[in-house]
Structure formats: structure tokens, C-alpha cells
């Protein structure tokens, strides 16, 4: 019987009697081992602190001498928290009695989780005011920030906890401190919408600083649609005329897209135009018309604005144009709302407009953002899902009488080119990063390493360079970004390959598809479990959009196309599996094994578990599916004989054959 599960479950479920009975008559060594053992990443003490079981915690600390600083993994609001100390768990969950007990037992009030979150920050997050006061009184440092540079004051402001913010400010918490990405408590407050806390911060000397995205708190409030905060901030003497105008224009765009309040948007834009017309007039910066926006130009007069009232679609395009002018093409919200509008078009059955807008956003992302940006990855995944839907649902009647149109192969090919390009960019970027890690350059000057928090009236002048820095910080810490991008590219390639043997592709387009697959295959990028594109094509769990049958793996057409452009049928993954192994580890798809074998796959290759194609087929006899003699070479027979009889071959055969022999 494994007692650690009994002990853990008793602690988790507040079953003190069970816990005592299980540990009764156990030696101190056994008790120590059981109460420090982890189940699902957590110890009995950690889970009992998380769940608020006072008596269990007291028993573990006093009778069992549990280490008050042991850490574990717990979940809050569905998010896993790694390396959380007991005090952090109790503070986050709001269990004041347990917090006091732990502190009395010597718990470090400034202990941190893996992300450098302190118990005090955890209490600030969910508004546990009494715990905040208790921890500060016992030495908790309210200026310790998490790994993102986010302080206790910032999170209290973001979550709208007025009393905690007021208390921290009374202790002289740094009101203008910046996070890693340059935002301050005033930014967090503007984004969350608490006017009361905003006024409190301003009273304590908060300034209108600019973050790494080029955003002031005023623009942050406009983007999130908090009109009371915008109205308050534009009355401040430190806010320039241009900043007031930009805030009203951007807030109007938010009311169009986020709140769907056209009347309020028109009123805000009218106020902005009237402000521009005041002497001396402040004209808008002329923007080149964008085809994806249907060549819409920004209105420059109240008369033009009134004419737009009867055309909601033009108002929606106007919102996109305004947002791109003010925030710049690099801001996440610029791309987000382009894609948001495209999704609405798709819901209305206007798939051509959706593809046009999404393509524009993707082009913009690849032109400006760093390779493997999360936004670019998201765009590619969205295209894969959209194309899957359109291929499967073509001809289906939608609401409002529209029909899902057949997909245009050239649209899909254009996006596939962009996906392959992103993998190429990502691979070059990853290799460059690896080189930099091996040969680190000299440190950047301090001014380049930390955000500059200086007051500014507008985001437009600095947004491009600062946002690129922010995205570099994001991508540098995501080792799986290249793999995810490759998977999206494989998925779109799979959709295209399903059209290769149909009349949907002209000979020239087929040549282009195969050329793009060749470019993708020659990169030799590996995905999860060190698998190639061909591995992925042969394995059921590769499916991204499982709702649509044409997108499901294994894909015979994709495997065939990849073999045609030179994919290695004998490449092995981290478990020694070839594509042929994976093709057999599922409900068997007979044509796939024939295609792989015809493409040069070795019939008798063993994976690291000693499994072959034949053993994985069992109990089905192999000869009922294929002709083994047809796919067994003399070289394979020789290699198998060498391995079977454990014949020493080093120095006897060429070194180039060693790997081949070991595969058998």
C-alpha cells in the first residue's frame, strides 16, 4: 500500500482522523518522508494550506515537524502555480488564521514562487486586505516584483482593490515604478477601469508615463473603453491637445468594435473633429489607403462624418484605420481588431473579406514583428482552422441565406507561402539565438535594458521600436514557438495536399504547392518529440482542427507529397520511431504503409523499445497486408543477421553503415 496517497488525500480533504491513523506508529523518518512526498506536484502541507484546513496544517507543523518552507504546485483559477510555498498558498486563498500560524512558525514572509510572486502579492491579487496588513506588519516587502516587474501596488490597482492600494500608498509604495514592459500602476488602473483608484494614484504623484508599447494611461483607457477614465484624464493640464484628440478618436474606435455602440462612437469622433478644428487647426496625418480596408480614407470633417451614419460597414473600416494610425501597425490591438473584424465577416458568410483582412494582418506582422511572434503564430493557426472549415463545409447553408463558398486554392497557397516563410525566419532566428548564447555579446547599456518611463503626449512616435523590444522579450523565452509554427505550416500544407489529385489545382499551381512543400521539408525542422513533417503526417495525434475530417491525420496525400519532395522515410524521433512505426500505432491506415514502403521505408527498423512494423501490427499477420519479400533488401537481411548474432562489426564495415545496422 502506498501511504503517501492516503496521507495526501487526508490532508487535501481535511480528514484529520485518517491522517493521524495513517501516521500512527510510523518512525520519524517514515513520517518525514510521507509528509514531504508530492502528489500531483503538491505536498500535504501545501495542499492543506491551499484548501484552508487549519487543523491539518497545525498537526503537520506541530506533531509531524513539516518543513514550513516546502514548496509545491497548486492551482488557482485554473492556472498552475509552480514552487508555491505554504504561506503563499494560504495568503492567495485568503486563510488569515493559517497565514498567522505559518508566520509564527518562522515562515519567510518574502518567499516566492517560481515566477517570483510573494505571499503579499498573492494577497493583493484577490483583495485579502487583512492578510496584506498582517504580512506587511511582519516584514513583507511590498516592493518585491514578480518576474514581469509587476509590483503589489500594480496588481492591487489592476484588480480594483481600493483599500489595498490606499494602504500601500500610505506606506510610500513607489507610485511610478515601471514593470519590465514599462507599464505603471496608473496604466494598470486605466486598463481595469477604476476611476476612484486612478484619482488616488494621481493624488499621490502618479505621472503619465509611456510603456514599451508606446501607450500612455490615457490611451490604455481608450483602448479598453473606459470612458469615465478618459473623460477625467483629458481634463488634466499635463495632457496635450493632440493627446486629447487621439484619446477621443481611439475611444470611438473601441466603441465601434468592442461595445458595438455606433452612436457613442460618432459622438466621440465628432468631438475629436471639433477639437481639431479649433484654431490653430490640427490636421490628421494622411494615411495611404489600404485595399483590405476597401480603400477607406479617414473622415476629416463633421460633414463627412454625418454622411457615414448610414453605412455601418464604413464605420467599422474607419475604426480600423484610426486605430492603425494612432497605435501603429506593431501594436497587438491593431492586428487583433483586424482579425476580429475578419472573424465577424466569416460569421456573416463573407469569407472573402475575412481572408483579405487576415492576410493583411499577417503580412503586417511578418513585416514588422520579430520571427515567431505569438501574434503571427495565432494568425497562422486561425487560417488553418478557417481553411479546414471552408473545405469541409463548402456548400452548407448559413444563417441569412448565405452559403459557405468553395475555397480559392490560390488564397490557401498564398498563406502557405507565408507559413513556410515564417518557419524559415523562425529557424534563422533560433539558430542566431543559439549562436548568441554560445558567444554572448557584451551587456547592453542600462538604458536599453530597462524601460524608459518619461512622460509623452503621443504613442505614435515610439510605438514601433518599443513594441519590437517587447516582442523580443516574449519570443526569447519560448522554446516551442518554432515547433508550433511548423505545425501550423504542416496543417495548411495538409489541406493543400488534399487538392493535389483533384481538378481544383492547375498543373502550374500543383507545381507551386510541391515547391512550397519542398522548401518546408528541406528546413528539417523538428516538432514535438523530435518528429519530422513526415512523422507528423503519419500520426493521428497531429490533428489540429479535429472537427473537420479533411484536416485529420494521418494524411495519405500529405505523406505522399512529402516523400515526393525528398522527405526521409527512415528518420527517427526521440523514441526511435520512423514514420512507419507511427503509421501503425493507431487504427491502421493501409495505404499509408504502402506509400511509405514504396518511398523507401525500411520494413524491419526497430525503435528504442525494440518494436518493428511487424510487431506493432500483431495479431494481424504482416503478409496479409504487404508482401514482405518486396520490401526486404539484402542489406536489411545482413544487418538483421549481424544484430541477431551479436557480431562485432566496428572496423570491419564502413563507419557510414553503423547507424543503418543499429536500426535493425
Swiss-Prot record:
Repeat positions for ANK: 40-70, 82-111, 115-144, 148-177, 181-210, 213-242, 529-571, 575-605
TPR repeat positions: 245-279, 335-368
GO cellular component: ubiquitin ligase complex
Record-stated family: Belongs to the fem-1 family.
Statement: the UniProt record of this protein carries the keyword RNA-binding: no
This protein's pathway: Protein modification; protein ubiquitination
Organism placement in taxonomy: Eukaryota, Metazoa, Ecdysozoa, Arthropoda, Hexapoda
Name of this protein: Protein fem-1 homolog CG6966
Subunit structure and binding partners: Component of a CRL2 E3 ubiquitin-protein ligase complex, also named ECS (Elongin BC-CUL2/5-SOCS-box protein) complex.
Keywords from the named record: ANK repeat, Repeat, TPR repeat, Ubl conjugation pathway
Residue span of region Disordered: 433-460
